[in-house]
């Protein structure tokens, strides 16, 4: 083990090497290059779904780099020929809300925000939590699909840093500070 000045020296040397090398953006779940969007399947193969104006395909070794926080689960391999409309019967939502949900899902395919917030509002037992779990499982499955509301700005930022979709359960109200913080993610 390196201690004291030896550790400090090693950090200084490695920092110097890092500063002289090319830097790369690191993405979480969804990344991009000049002409394509990539969705990390987060499996052992490190394959990704490449999306272009011509369609999509699964690729080995995508040209973008992804990070995978603890708790991130792999996405199932997509199958050609499906329709987003097959999702509608699984959700408790009306026709107008369904249009907003589809727009929200589409926005999540953009590697850089801003992103709209999706808020389910309703009485107890109206499948708000269930809807959140279903939608999160589509693009960002994780061990903890829904979290408790954040108590501090730091809690919110940690949650947002560790998942592509941050979903909170039993958020009875959104105060001004939390509203501002959510808009800054």
Where are these regions (language model features)?
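Segments of Walker-type
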Residues: 1-96
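Glycine-centered small-residue hotspots that permit tight backbone geometry or close packing
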Residues: 36-37, 127, 170
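Structured core elements
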Residues: 38-40, 119, 166-167
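Short helix/loop capping segments that flank catalytic or ligand/cofactor-binding pockets
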Residues: 47-51, 129, 175-177
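P-loop NTPase catalytic core of nucleic-acid-dependent motor ATPases
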Residues: 53-164
């Amino acid at each position: 083990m390196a201690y004291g000045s030896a550790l400090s020296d090693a950090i200084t040397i490695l920092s110097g090497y890092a500063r002289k090398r090319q830097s790369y953006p690191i993405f979480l779940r969804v990344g991009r290059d000049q002409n394509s969007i990539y969705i990390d399947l987060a499996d052992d193969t490190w394959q990704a779904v490449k999306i272009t104006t011509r369609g999509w395909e699964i690729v080995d070794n995508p040209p973008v780099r992804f990070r995978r926080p603890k708790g991130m689960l792999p996405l199932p391999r997509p199958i050609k020929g499906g329709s987003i409309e097959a999702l509608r019967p699984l959700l408790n939502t009306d026709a107008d809300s369904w249009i907003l949900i589809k727009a929200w899902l589409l926005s999540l395919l953009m590697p850089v925000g801003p992103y709209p917030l999706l808020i389910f509002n309703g009485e107890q037992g109206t499948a708000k939590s269930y809807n959140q779990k279903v939608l999160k499982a589509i693009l960002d499955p994780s061990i903890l699909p829904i979290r408790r509301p954040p108590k501090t700005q730091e809690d919110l930022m940690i949650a947002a840093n560790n998942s592509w979709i941050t979903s909170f359960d039993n958020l009875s109200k959104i105060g001004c500070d939390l509203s501002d913080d959510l808009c800054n993610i």
